[in-house]
């Protein structure tokens, strides 16, 4: 039997199964930033908050009024860990004080300068901004996968950047050819 690398879910989407009852993850689509022997880290990308970039900028640079377009840039709940910490997924190309290039032509930036750049019209134009992240201890995500808590879907930048937040979960499921309303809550193991 071929051994699967423990990082096999990095740069994939996790689709919460319909029977997921954890309020932090029920009906979520999560982008997996990292998955290795030490655990996993991801960002929920379909949970918009009532908070906007304008609200965040009011806290970060209160001396400057936020540009009007910032009222239309929604902040998402990225997960239950460190909910005061910001993360921005965006296409690769621009780098900021704290930017990590990820597979598939996307980057993750965590410094305030990315927010200022978006606000000031210098981009990145395509972005998903989250507060908080989802974290799993070593083996925890693997165990949840074995318990059928999640489906996995290969990454598609169109789902991340071109699909409205409230449609991302269904778009990822459609990519697999699945209607989440028709999935059984019971599964067997051969």
From Swiss-Prot:
Belongs to the UPF0301 (AlgH) family. This is UPF0301 protein Psyr_0485. GO terms for cellular component: cytosol. It comes from Pseudomonas syringae pv. syringae (strain B728a).
